[in-house]
Amino acid sequence: MAIAQNQDIKYRIKDELKMPDFNYGDIWEDPKSGHRIGCLDISKKEDVEKLMHGQKAVLAVQDPPYNVDINDEFGNLPLNQYMAWSEKWVDNIIDILDANASLYIWSGADVKNGLQPLPDFMIMMRDKPVKIRSFITMRNQRGYGTQKNWMAIRQELLYYVKGNPIFNVQAEYTDILKKTKGYYKKINGKITENFERSKSLTIRAGNVWHDIQQVFYLMHE
C-alpha cells in the first residue's frame, strides 16, 4: 500500500510540474523577485537588450554549447562558424555588463578534435575589454571513459572581470578540514610541514572544484 501511495504522489507531482511553454521572443518576469527568463537568441544584440530592459549586470554566467556532437540536442559546427557565433554573443554580453562586473564562461575541449573550442575561445577573448582572472576546473559527478584512456571527468570555467568588481575572499573559506600533509620547510632552524605553518585548519576554495551538485539538462529533476 505504501509503495502504491508513493507512486501515486510521484505521478501527481509530475503532472503538476509541467515544463513552461515558451515561444521565441517570450520573456517571463517573476512577480516576486523580478527575475526575467527569456526564450531569445543571445547572438542578437536586440534580444539581449530586450531581456536586460535597460539595466546592467554585475555578474554574468554563460554556459554555451561546447561544439561537441554528443547527442541529438546539439550538433557541432565548423570551428570558424562556431567562433564567429561565439564572438557575437560574447560582445553582446560584455556590452550589458556594468563598469565593474564578473563574467564566468563554461567551456569544453574535444580531445578528438584538437581540444577545440577551448583554446580558440581563450585566444579570441584576449582582444575583448575584459581580463582573465582564473582558469577553473570542475570535477564532474560522472564522466565517460574507455579502456585505453583516462576517464574524461573535467569541465573548464573561465573567470573574467570588467573593471574592478568586488571579490569576497571570505566566502572562499570552507568548513572542510585539511587532510594532506607535506611541503616541508625549515623555519628558524626547525623543519615544519604545511599544517604547522598554516593560519587555518580548513580548506580555502581554489580553482579546482569538486563535490558540486549538478543538474543534468537531459533529466527532468
Where are the regions a protein language model picked out?
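Core catalytic lobe of class I
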Residues: 1-220
